[in-house]
């Protein structure tokens, strides 16, 4: 029986991996799930596993939070013995987080075939850590599963052979369709704005965050604003006076 190992580490990975795991469950394929623990808070990890119907990870590497280099390096260090022992026929990685890059590098060193789900996306901004992760992961991947025609073209422009490119669509839509009926049961305002804010370039600079907080407060005077807050963002917001007290600005846990 062929063996596939899925490596995930953060919220964006979970919602992409869930439909792939379910689809492969219908085939005679052995599957293992490795969670690096890049996102480790219960509201950032466990609740997503429950809501998405993901199985308990076979391995939780408890990498935790650190700088990009340290986090990636520790994930590689902990992934290597797991993949060396498992020797799967394919490792699947998702998106562009540090865990994705770490698994890609380990697979390259161990000569294990690698597939990248959500390959080919580009911002063309190398100041973004995710862009570096995407480009390197795609260069190391044997199978590139793309969400769109522009992703295909990006890979071709970088010299990737057509035989390696497989357009499968946006797998997050599968998760959306599966969870959408449950949203209709929620009691919430009829019209509202949904906000997400977590990029370091937005939340680590007090001046930038202050302007954004002011804009959210102004927006909440026009339409109710629902804001699922990343723990790191919440800590930064606590230093910004007034944003948490706006009447129609609803700060929620990230799940």
Where are these regions (language model features)?
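N-terminal beta-loop-helix "entrance" segment that forms/cooperates
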Residues: 39-55
